[in-house]
Amino acid sequence: MSSINTTFTKQHRQCDEMFADAEAAVAAGNWQQAGQDFSAFATSMECHLTNEEEILFPAFEDKTGMREGPTMIMRDEHIHIRRLINEMTSDIEQQDADHYLGLSETMLILMQQHNTKEEQMLYDMCDRALGDDAKDQVLHNMKDLG
């Protein structure tokens, strides 16, 4: 059986790779490719965030009763990630490389810090708190990033 940590960390790495592809395309001035790459990143990131917010976090909260702990903090950070994605989408549409690349640095730092908290704390907590049946249900209900 896969662990929560292994499965969700894999999604982080997939999103990281897509984000790097989009950044490289913007830096190269290849706006068509940048649009495709960033759209793929945004779609995959939204799928990942939804997997957490609608499947993993509720299972963890139901099992532990912790509704105002780490999952609340992660949800708040998800709001910031979504805002940056919206701004960066606009930058690609306007072909504003300087603004995009500035936001890209902010997004990269945010994602690194966010992923570290999840991978080194929250996912392990989920693996410990959820029994095998609940873990299997979470992993079964997840949507693939594509």
Where are these regions (language model features)?
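Small-residue-biased structural context
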Residues: 1-146
